[in-house]
Amino acid sequence: IISNLYDYVTGVEVGLGSNGRKNRGGHQMEDLVESYLKKAKLEYYKEMYLTEIEEKWQVNLSAISAEGTSTKRWDFVVKTDSCIYVIETNFYTSGGSKLNETSRSYKMIAEEAKNVKDFKFVWITDGAGWRSARRNLEETFNVLDTLYNITDMENDIFSKLFK
């Protein structure tokens, strides 16, 4: 119900509702990924900032943090005996600029992560939105060997990845 014509015209009420709908898929994807992390009996951390990772495991992530200027928060972090894995998850029901920008951003993170010893960036994404951004996804896939989707999780990728 629209309670204020001015807010509707300026997008306040519509925007808030739309943002909630847009984020719903992302939260559902996070929940799904978490269920597979639990199923694989992995020790993991949720919503961990880059600085928290640096402090907890005494690792220098300046190559990823733009020399300490980034405040990146990862959806999940898995720490094994030999590696720190940072995980980003998302699900896109439709295409658009957000999806393209995310792909470009994650491609850059993948390239930067290669400069950090015993550190891997993992991206788990899915959804029909990728049909319209196939080229962007392919470009990222070419530099990120840890790019997965829901089918990969169903096929137990975590037991192979987190050794």
Where do the language-model regions lie?
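Catalytic cores of nucleic-acid endonucleases
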Residues: 90-135, 139
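Domain-level recognition of nuclease-like catalytic cores that cleave nucleotide substrates
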Residues: 122-163
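Glycine-centered loop/turn motif at secondary-structure junctions
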Residues: 41-43, 117, 144
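Interdomain/boundary linker segments immediately adjacent to catalytic/signaling cores
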Residues: 1-41
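Short, well-structured alpha-helical interface segments that form or flank functional binding sites
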Residues: 24, 28-32, 71, 101-108, ...
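Active-site beta-strand-loop-beta-strand hairpin of nuclease catalytic cores
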Residues: 69-86
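A short acidic/basic microdomain associated with nuclease active sites
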Residues: 39-68
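Short loop/turn segments at strand-loop or loop-helix junctions that form parts
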Residues: 9-11, 81, 87-92, 126
